[in-house]
Structures are given as C-alpha cells and as structure tokens.
C-alpha cells in the first residue's frame, strides 16, 4: 500500500543509530483533525472503514529494509499516524524511547511501536502512551502479505511501560506472513486496555506461534 513518507526515514541502511535526549514533535494534530472530519462524512454514507485508507496520515519514524539499526533515548510525540514502524528489517534495537501521542488532542491509529515483517528485534526500556496499540507486531496484510510472505519473528520486549493504549503487546491484525517467537518480560501496564491482544480477520491467513508475555505489574488492564 502506498503511504506518505514518515517524518524521519531510515531506508536501505546498515549499522546506523539515532540517539540522544532530544524530542521529535511531529505536530500531527492536523492529521488527527482531518481524519475526524472525514470520518463524520464517511459515516453518513456508511463508508466508515474506507476513511482509514483515504485519510493518509504521516508516521513519526520508519525503518525499512535495513539491518543493525538502533534508536535510543529520545522522545517521539504527536505523530500523525503510527509512531515508529520497523518494516522488512533485521537486528534492530529500540531502547529507552518515550512515545507520547496524547498531547493536545485524540490521535486515531497512533500506535506507539509497530514491528512489521521484521526479525530479531529488541524493544527495551520504552514508555508508550498512545491511542491505539502500544507495541504492535504485524506480518503483512491479505493478498499482498501472502505474496511477500515475510514473518515477524524472534522479538523480545522487556522493561517497557504501557500507559494509555489498546494493548501493551498486540499481535495483528496483519498476520499473513506469520508472527513467531515473541518473548515479553518485566513489563508494566497502567491504563492500556489489554496486556496481550491478538487480532486478525477470517480471510487474512497466517499464524501466531510461541508468544509469551509476562507483565510484572498491571493496573486498569485486562
């Protein structure tokens, strides 16, 4: 699916890092407001689901087709769409990120971290406050996902905090390429709706194998 470029893009790279105590404010409220305005119009025509595709919003960061990438110790906030997406990549580390998409409005589909068709990923010491999945694992969607057939596997999530959101760790709904070997431990959930959320669709295909999250502390979560 064609989607707008992210604010920061790491494409076809190897052995690179972005680190430091700075803040990337993506000022995504303009996209949030556009979505809610379009949604009202689409709902009147019983086309609510289409607005998710027609209202293309900008991600905060994208790592794509890359290896040995590290993101460390900065704040990412007010992204127009997903916060940080790791796509078709291997051996990446996200350490000490603070993602806050609950500043100045209600951002739709503002996932914190999305790992998509990628392998050997470490997510640690991150804090995510958002309006959708806190940390989400995906592996391609429908026919295109089956065509690409790249799994998300060998994922470790540890020492992370999920605040507002729709799932500390969510698998899916993009599952076509399979999600395998996920380990989560020493995790804290304060306000997210679920600690582990599994979702897919009847015609999507794929599999979900060997997932083991172990939250240490939960509050107002299922």
Give names to the regions the model predicted.
Residues 210-217:
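Conserved small/polar residues in nucleotide/adenosyl-binding loops
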Residues 27-31, 59, 80-86, 103-111, ...:
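Short glycine/acidic-rich loop motifs that flank beta-strands on beta-rich extracellular proteins
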Residues 106, 121, 155, 177:
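Glycine-rich phosphate/ribose-binding loops and adjacent secondary-structure elements
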Residues 15, 21, 68, 91, ...:
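Detector for repetitive beta-architecture
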Residues 1-17, 29-43, 50-67, 82-89, ...:
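Extracellular beta-strand-rich solenoid/capping regions of secreted or surface-exposed proteins
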Residues 11, 19-21, 25, 64, ...:
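Feature marks extracellular polysaccharide-active and adherence modules
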